[in-house]
Each structure stands twice: as C-alpha cells, then as structure tokens.
C-alpha cells in the first residue's frame, strides 16, 4: 500500500542532494507502520520489527534505537518537502481536488512540569491545564485526507497560527482554496489574510455579542432544505467593501435537543421562582431578575433553537460539518495511533514524532476511504494473516497462511496484489518438501 501510494518515491525525492543512508526510507516506513499497527516507543518498535512482523528490508536494524532517531532527524530537516511530496503523490493517485481545506488545532500534554520553550503551558484542549503541552494543527481535504500537520509551542494562539498555515500552503500552489475553520479563527485580521489572492473563508460565528451577527439573525427569510434535519437561508449584511454574506443554519435535531434542555432549565427556573413566593415587591423583583440574569440559565430564554451563524463563501452548511472529519482525525491521532505518551524531550524529536503520526494517519485514511471500513477493522482482519518458519534437513522455508475472503476483499479494494505464499526459502524445491515433512 505504501509503495502504491508513492510514499517511498516521495521520501526519496525529498532525500535528493542529502548525504543519507539509502535505507532511511525503510526505517521511516517501519516507524510509520509501527504507529499504525502497534504504537510503541522507538526502542519497543525495534523489537516489534524484528520479532512480530515480516518487513522485507528491515531485518538488520539491530538493537540501537539511534537508527530511528537519525531517521527522525532527517524527517524534521526535510519535513515540509516530505509532507508536500507525500501528499501530492497521494492526491494524484486518488484524484483528490484540493479546493477546500478544513483546519483545526488540538493539543497534547506531557507528563512533566517543566516549561522548556516548546512544551509550554497554555489553553489545553485535553483538559489538562496542569501540564505543559504542544499545539498541533491539521489541514484536511473534504474527503478527510490530511494535507499537512504543524506543531507549535503550547502557548500558541489559534488566531495567529492559521496565518502561518495559510502562508506555508500558499507555496504549494493549491490554486483557489476555501478555508473552513471554527470560530476561534474568525478574527477580521484572519479573514483579510486568508482572502488574499482570491482565497475564501468559511468560519463559524458567535450567536451573540457581534452587531453583524445579530443583524443576520434578525433578518427574515425562508429556509432552504439541505437535508431532513438541516435547513439554511442566505443573508447579506452591510454595504460596499464591508458587505458580508451569512448562512443561517438551523439543525432540527439540535433544535429538538436544545428545546429539551431548555425545558429542563425552565423547570429549574420555575422551582427557584416558586421558592421566592414568600417575597414581594422590590425584593421579589430583584430575586427574579437575578435568576433570569443567570449566565447559564438565561441563554435558554433567548433566541437559540439550534441556530448557528456562520460566515461563508460556498456550500456552507455541509462544508462546516466537515470539521467533524478534523475532530475525528485528532481522535484517531490520540486514540488509534496513540500520539501520547510522547517519550521525547527535545523539540526536534517531538516535531518528528508528530509528523510520523501524521503519515500514519494519512495511510489509514486512504485505506478507510478505499474499503469503506474503519482502520481497526482493517487492521484486525489483516492481522490474522500469519507467516510461519519451517525448518528441516533440507533447509528452511517461510510461508504465510491462506488468504481469507475478507482479507482478499480488502487487498482488492486497495489494489494490492496478494503476497506470495512462499515468503522466503534457501533451497528452493527441496525446502518445500522438507517443510511439509516437518509440519
């Protein structure tokens, strides 16, 4: 699969002009495969490669994890080139059109209290403000294929990092791109920056607190039906150069949940108000006003009902929901690929580790898109294919188990030929007979 996607060639191209061991691609492949199949430390990955899997070309890695660290150092030096070459190799093969980029950030924390410049305290999206962290950014296509990954010190702000992301991807010549992001990126400076050279943006907006948003919400108009649960309408606010287009999206499923939640809070309000029945006059009015001004309860007494205001350029409602693919990618990075714990202290190794996880994520997304199966199902199914080594008087032979129908379907969907039954031998036809006798 890796070869079919052109990853070795892409890494080889990034290696051009560098004095490197020609086996660096195999070493990086081992690290990516380990991350996708059995995430472990670099030292444990050596044992995994030697004892648990059949990986041609990586038999002589030895027992020193420095072989991995040297490859990771190269990966960091050529990070941008490797990611660019790998992505375009995948995009060309799968005919992916990069006209929409969905971007979001997450964080991963470290089991230490040291704040050392890259591992910094900041706003934790893992709900661990007591630990230093690193911020990770991910750009994803509308098909869910990751385009590129970034990492920043743990105190980096969303409003700043997206400008760096835009500037770096501009060098990739992706033509005209629609940027989709959450409301944390929706500053006026970011809009102006991203719309340079004809770019477009689709950002979420706060329901309240911004005059244009309030004006958009108050504007009458009919909703168009996108799906059974999603209705949208278009609203224009402002004049001249400041004129902005909004899409008011009404999610009926969320509106129903909001109504149920609002009902529970109203019941609580009624209970609280009934408790004030003994009060009268100004005291009662003051108590009621305090309840109705409650920062949590009062929001269920104003215009909400599942409506979301987003600033857009095209295909707004459906594209914004595509941010769920980015969130899913972050979950897979942390849970399936086990981004944490990070066993590295140096900034360059942490960055390289994150890039390795990105490469593994790209491979599993391609596999999922091609097969229609989740990666855990694919991995479990293919893990049932085993290789056995048989020895006898005539020599040695390594042979795999028969391919099951489920395995064959996965290989066919990925356009991968079935591996040879006989994986390795030393005395050709005589060994087969000897192996059969020893079995």
Region roles according to the model:
Residues 1-2:
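Short, compositionally biased segments
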Residues 9-439:
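Anion-binding and metal-coordination hotspots
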């Amino acid at each position: 699969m890796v070869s079919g996607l052109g990853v070795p060639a892409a890494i080889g191209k990034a290696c051009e002009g560098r004095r490197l061991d020609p086996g660096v691609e195999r070493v990086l492949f081992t690290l990516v495969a380990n991350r996708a199949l059995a995430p472990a430390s670099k030292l444990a990955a050596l044992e995994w490669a030697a004892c648990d899997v059949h990986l041609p070309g990586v038999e002589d890695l030895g027992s020193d994890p420095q072989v991995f660290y040297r490859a990771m150092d190269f990966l960091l030096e050529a990070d941008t080139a490797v990611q660019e070459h790998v992505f375009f190799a995948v995009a060309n093969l799968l005919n992916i059109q990069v006209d929409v980029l969905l971007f979001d950030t997450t964080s991963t924390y470290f089991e230490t209290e040291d704040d050392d410049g890259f591992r910094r305290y900041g706003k934790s999206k893992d709900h661990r403000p007591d630990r230093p962290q690193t911020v990770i950014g991910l750009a994803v296509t509308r098909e869910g294929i990751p385009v590129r990954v970034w990492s920043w010190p743990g105190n980096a702000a969303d409003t700043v990092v997206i400008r760096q992301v835009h500037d770096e991807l501009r060098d990739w010549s992706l033509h005209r791109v629609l940027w989709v992001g959450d409301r944390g990126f929706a500053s006026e400076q970011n809009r102006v920056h991203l719309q340079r050279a004809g770019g477009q943006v689709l950002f979420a907006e706060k329901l309240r607190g911004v005059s244009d948003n309030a004006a958009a919400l108050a504007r009458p108009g009919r909703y168009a039906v996108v799906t059974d649960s999603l209705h949208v309408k278009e609203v224009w606010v402002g004049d001249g150069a400041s004129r902005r287009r909004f899409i008011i999206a009404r999610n009926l499923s969320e509106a129903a949940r909001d109504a149920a939640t609002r009902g529970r809070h109203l019941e609580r309000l009624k209970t609280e108000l009934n408790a004030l029945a003994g009060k009268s006059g100004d005291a009662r009015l003051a108590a009621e006003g305090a309840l109705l001004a409650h920062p949590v309860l009062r929001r269920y007494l104003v215009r909400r009902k599942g409506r979301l205001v987003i600033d857009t350029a095209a295909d707004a409602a459906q594209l914004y929901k595509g941010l769920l693919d980015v969130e899913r990618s972050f979950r897979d990075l942390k849970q399936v690929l086990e981004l944490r714990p990070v066993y590295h202290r140096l900034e360059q190794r942490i960055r390289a580790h994150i890039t390795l996880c990105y490469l593994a994520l790209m491979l599993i997304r391609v596999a999922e898109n091609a097969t229609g199966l989740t990666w855990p199902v694919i991995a479990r199914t293919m893990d049932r294919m085993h290789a056995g080594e048989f020895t006898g008087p005539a020599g040695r032979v390594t042979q795999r188990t028969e391919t099951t129908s489920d395995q064959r379907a996965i290989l066919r969907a990925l356009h991968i030929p079935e591996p040879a039954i006989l994986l390795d031998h030393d005395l050709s036809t005589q060994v087969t007979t000897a192996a059969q006798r020893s079995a």
